[in-house]
Amino acid sequence: MKIVIVGTGAMGSVYAALLADSGNEVWAIDLWQEHLDAINDHGLQVSGASGERTVRNIQVSTRAADAGPCDLVVIATKASAVGAAARSLTSNLTDETLVLTIQNGLGAGERISKNLDSANILLGVAGGFGASVPEPGHVHHNGMELIRLGEMHGGMSERLEHVAKVWQDAGFNVKTFADINQLIWEKFICNVALSGAAAAFDRTLGEVMDDPVTWEIAKKLGLEAYRVGKAKGIHFSFEDPVQYISDFGSKMPKAKPSMLLDLMAKRRTEIDAINGMVPVVAKEQGLDAPYNEAIAAVIKTKESAFTN
């Protein structure tokens, strides 16, 4: 399969390395020239959960157009860059090309569908999956639990199963689901509660949960998102969202979520797609979400210290 991966930071680099190492033709597209040059000159070094290896058959470019038509596009950018990534794909798409987006938060599929045919969009949810880039040309894979895939408009299909098989053959634990939006929302409420609080208060997930004050705020954040999802018609697999969030966080108490890592590195976060999205969807449902409005404002204030 010919695969174009747009956004080869930490997660995208893991996708590129494993998919290329299993025999697919993979193009890595990114604006980080130093990283691309290192991959081109020395291969992409992988360490950690998926094993030690150097993958040398990845083609790189700063322009998606250089890759030409392909079978699958994987958008692995930050949530804020999804729309721009979709607009860059004109030369990569045929009637059969599938576009898979794996992001935190809500709305990635909708942003892509403003530019591309939504009938060819697949959505993914990565769980227990972490990575970092210690230096250009080197990705460290912290963990790999499960990638869930589904059709944007629901249901099962042969093409969905085929894409899943390609990822499974590359070493990923992948399952397909008829209602991927349920799974996106279930991860979303955990990110809203724990990532939002961790980023706002500069805590690991365990520290958020151990402090009665921050844990109470985290619970309020998650409950707001849960109520909004229920109003929107999401069929959650659980009745107790607080217990679900607690179970999620307890699996990785030392984790620093991506929004906190972004703030520590003085980068823009994905707050608009996480806590900032809750009030937006709440308003559509005739609800409000004051805790998430407040946390989003706190994190945006932190961002303003280094983005203005």
Residue ranges and their predicted role:
Residues 1-52:
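NAD(P)+-binding Rossmann beta1-loop-alpha1 motif at the extreme N-terminus of oxidoreductases
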Residues 17, 21, 87-91, 114, ...:
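Short, well-ordered alpha-helices that flank and scaffold nucleotide-derived cofactor binding pockets
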Residues 217-308:
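NAD(P)-dependent Rossmann-like dehydrogenase/reductase catalytic/cofactor-binding core
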Residues 5, 29, 75-76, 102, ...:
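Active-site-adjacent beta-strand anchor residues
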Residues 92, 115-120, 135-192, 196-238:
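Internal alpha-helical scaffold of NAD(P)-dependent oxidoreductase catalytic cores
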Residues 34, 80-81, 106-107, 155, ...:
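Short alpha-helical
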Residues 29, 53-138:
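Rossmann-like NAD(P)(H) cofactor-binding subdomain of soluble oxidoreductases
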